[in-house]
Amino acid sequence: MLEVAQKYLQLKSGEYYKCFGKVDKVVGLTIESIGPKAKLNDLCMIFLDKERRDYVMSEVVGFKDSHIILMPFDNVEGVGVGCIVENTGHPLTVAVGDELLGHTVDGIGRVTDCDEKDLELDSEYPIEAPPPDPMSREIISDVLPLGVKAVDGLITVGKGQRIGIFAGSGVGKSTLLGMFARNTKADINVIALIGERGREVREFIERDLGPEGMARSVVVLSLIHISEPTRPRLIS
């Protein structure tokens, strides 16, 4: 009887079919779908062909009557009424690991300069993480050497401190950031280039950052021509 009960539980918990939804409306920057069953922040794929090879990644951001409201992460070109929608059942995550160093990723963590399958990334990390408890934050007390004497000597930066660099175009903001990335005592740099032009990205990586800085950096690219929904997601 115990074996029969175990088999029954296996059958009861098994998944024997998959529910899909269909795109019903595209309104502004959002897509409305009839089904599938979903909850807020679930990651969904909107397929652009019957073979379900090409798809647009999207996130459940709300509900309206019997519709699911989706916010796409990619360009919505090709999305139309009737496109199949599949729910992955989990929120958006990004692959992380030491082999990500020296590479560039897009606004939602996809590797852009090689095939992600060639990298041995340790785990998946959710992008929606609760903020740390204010009382658990360390007090800023240690100096973070940035390797630029004028900054280290006159406007010393502490570990964990936020700073802003404000200046007009072409006066050296990117050059200064590149100097920080190459010379800082930090083990890893995460550099987000948001709203940059394509040529400016290559100039920063090759000239300002250089091979030495890039070797211990991960560069997040959110170029000026990307779809609007992706940009605020990355900035947040």
Residue spans for each PLM region:
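P-loop NTPase nucleotide-binding/switch module
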Residues: 83, 112-161, 176-179, 213-224
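The Walker A (P-loop) glycine that initiates the GxxxxGKT/S ATP-binding motif of P-loop NTPases
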Residues: 167-168
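Single conserved hydrophobic/aromatic residue that forms the stacking wall/gate
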Residues: 224-236
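N-terminal accessory targeting/assembly segments
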Residues: 1-103, 107-112
